[in-house]
Amino acid sequence: MRDSNHADKTWPLTWSAAVLLLGAGAAQALSLAWPFDGDWSGATQGWLQCLSMIVLAGILDRSQSRQQAFFSGWIFSSAWLVGSTWWLFISMNKYGGLPAPMAALAVGLLASGLALFYGAACAVFYAVCKTGVSILLRASAFAAVWVLAEIVRGTVFTGFPWGAVGYAHLDSVLQHWAPWVGVYGLCALSAFIAMAIGAEKRERKSISGVGKVGLVFLVAALAYTWATSPSRADNDEHRSKHPLRVTLLQGNIPQDLKFGEGVNRALRDYSEALLSSTSDFIVTPETAIPLIQQQMPDRYWQPLEAHFSKGSQAAMIGLPLAMRSEQGQLKYSNSVIGLMPQTNPAASANYQYDKHHLVPFGEFVPPLFQWFVRMMNIPLGEFTPGSVAQPSLMFKGERIAPNICYEDLFGEELARSFADPNKAPTLMVNLSNIAWFGNTVAIDQHLNISRMRALELGRPMLRATNTGATAIINARGEVTHRLPSAVQGALTAEVYGIHGSITPYAQWVSRFGLWPLVGFALLILLLASATAYASRHGQRRFGP
């Protein structure tokens, strides 16, 4: 369908459609965590995400060429991803010293580059479904290409799946499918709904008999999984018999002082808090102690070790570590040290977790990007990654699994620890410092990411952060306790670990990763392609 204001044939979309897509993409970014003050502040808005994607689906469905389809997806996704990650500008400009125009350009290039995946997905959708495909199969194909684009964005070049559309449904009716299919499955469901509603109701192939049977099974499966979702079940029978009293520390050390003038303050404040707390389990933020042990003042670390080894408490402390390789070279890691009672007085080894999923430009420099790093004044290091699914800390009957910073963005990696139900974590802990991004919506977005992991995996998540959001999340993904952001404080509460019960998502992802989703999406695209081909060539249609 052409518009009268399509004056330039070299431009694949009307200006009105482009503006509408930009607005819809921006609205989708808002749906992930409402950035404005008020009752909705920080909350997800699933309804807004659905409306935004319906706009994309409607325009995409009316595309006249693959070029139009590509640019529809690319423009929408560029606006959405800029709106989701604009706060990267703060780290590059304020803390990295990159001039404002260059920092803004870098954010725009990142977002528009990642949006290429979605543009390509929309072009594939057009090629497969331009004719001879029913609404049901059309919506299924759109869900398939969208989830494939989300997975590709979340895995290639180390992956950056921040802002995936599924996060907008933490508080919508779709949340109950998260323990079955995870955030990527919610992405597919939201895309399916959007195309089913937004597709132009012009002449389409009616749903075949096979398709009607398939639709009945689909509705039945969705109803069953929704009704039996672990998120709707009572976890009392699986929770620990006795609560664990925890204290989560929030230092609120300004990022521009953290590795300079703020070092002495951090050493003093965290040492005092760790030694004075009466809780069973105390957690500091990521790199709360911003020095490797060899750089610490004399008699700083030893009193901490002695305090926890002789008492009945445990602590997780975030700090960088330096170890010498067999070749004598120093290797650095972003780590967590666990201090706890030592049953064997001769034992001196502490629990250690090394961050596995490192941040590009923060903890390692990607190939060919040294020139970009040299333009910024950020203390970067080449860190060594730890392994996936490292052992949990064992304390008072709980298996406590830490993750650092944006590692909780990769649910498929956290799920690897659930492969053996007898060794699966009963509690998860996230240690973060996102002060790099200021007191912005990034704090609420990251909190919602942790909420999704708790919901997917059916385990409480404890969050200890430098500036926020320090919080306790139950196994249903609900925030039960939270400190205000950008203040110094300690959050103390009682939590119960969850034992035995493993969510369906944790079961299949821990064994097969995301491949079942990829395979199912490709199967749908194959079916849609075969159906469209048969319809165009006058053959009997065998798809739905």
Which sequence ranges carry the predicted segments?
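Membrane-embedded alpha-helical bundles of multi-pass enzymes
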Residues: 2-231, 431, 439-440, 480, ...
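Soluble catalytic domains of enzymes that build or remodel membrane lipids, polysaccharides, and related
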Residues: 228-510
